[in-house]
């Protein structure tokens, strides 16, 4: 049986450096020698884009690219010249889909107004619970991830975001924007504390652990 695909991206908004710390947690865990990491590598093919907006990061922009574009509003019909990374990533996704079934796309972000870590997903009328299962599992593995704050909708105003554009492209339930507060948590062991870089890296690790639980893949700990 062909391995299923997982696509994870971050830093489309240059100022959201907390997304890079979550991504570091993802990558460090994925390349580790733990039984869980081996199980993930044995069962999935991962495509990872750590920085979607490198020009914006290098030049110190907060939200936009060098062309003054919010790239997370340009996924629907990206321009090869103005939005080259979006254009290339959509081509990569299409190629990936031809190779194998894609199980999940997750785009990592930072949030400046809300506390905790949470997800935005898509509401699928025919199967409304299908997009909620993975975030619910994640909430049971990490007490500063909030399922209650997670939202699921298909808003016309958000059609240009990766979450909705990739849903139109892939037509699968597990397409998420994961948002980490610039502040901290108001629940669990980190209540009333700021998130540290270690906390954010832990969140990246928990994301992959939730994938193990969700997919039911065996973990050989011998």
How should each PLM-predicted stretch be described?
Residues 1-222:
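Structured catalytic-domain cores with a bias toward divalent-metal coordination
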């Amino acid at each position: 049986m062909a391995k299923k695909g997982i696509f994870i991206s971050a830093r489309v908004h240059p100022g959201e450096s907390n997304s890079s710390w979550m991504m570091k947690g993802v990558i460090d865990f994925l390349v580790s020698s733990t039984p869980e990491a081996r199980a993930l590598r044995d069962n999935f093919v991962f495509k990872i884009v750590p920085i979607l907006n490198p020009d914006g990061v290098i030049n110190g922009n907060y939200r936009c690219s060098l062309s003054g574009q919010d790239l997370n509003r340009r996924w629907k019909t990206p321009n090869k010249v103005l939005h080259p990374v979006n254009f290339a990533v959509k081509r990569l996704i299409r190629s990936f889909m031809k190779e194998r079934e894609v199980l999940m796309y997750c785009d990592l972000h930072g949030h400046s107004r809300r506390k905790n870590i949470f997800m935005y997903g898509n509401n699928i009328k025919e199967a409304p619970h299908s997009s909620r299962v993975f975030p619910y599992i994640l909430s049971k593995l990490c007490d500063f991830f909030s399922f209650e704050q997670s939202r699921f909708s298909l808003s016309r105003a958000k059609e240009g975001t990766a979450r909705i554009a990739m849903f139109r492209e892939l037509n699968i339930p597990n397409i998420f924007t994961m948002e980490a507060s610039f502040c901290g948590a108001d629940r669990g062991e980190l209540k009333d504390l700021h998130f540290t870089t270690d906390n954010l890296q832990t969140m990246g690790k928990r994301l992959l652990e939730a994938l193990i639980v969700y997919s039911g893949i065996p973990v050989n700990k011998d």
